[in-house]
Amino acid sequence: DRDSCVDKSRCAKYGYYGQCEVCCKKAGHRGGTCDFFKCKCKV
């Protein structure tokens, strides 16, 4: 789910967010971005 993406995906502060994108899409979201080292999923 959304929280599992945030927990397990580490990323640069404003950098690469490929992990977030993939994880969020698998969780049923449109994608994700990186915000202060955490993944934020787009609903």
From Swiss-Prot:
Keyword Secreted: yes
Pfam families: Toxin_17
Cysteine-cysteine disulfides: 5-23, 11-34, 20-39, 24-41
A single MF term (Gene Ontology): potassium channel inhibitor activity
Localization per Swiss-Prot or TrEMBL: Secreted
Function text: Blocks Kv11/ERG potassium channels.
Protein family: Belongs to the ergtoxin family. Gamma-KTx 3 subfamily.
This protein's domain notes: The presence of a 'disulfide through disulfide knot' structurally defines this protein as a knottin. Has the CSalpha/beta fold, which comprises one or two short alpha helices connected to anti-parallel beta-sheets stabilized by three or four disulfide bonds.
Name by which UniProt lists this protein: Potassium channel toxin gamma-KTx 3.3
Organism: Centruroides sculpturatus
Lineage of producing organism: Eukaryota, Metazoa, Ecdysozoa, Arthropoda, Chelicerata
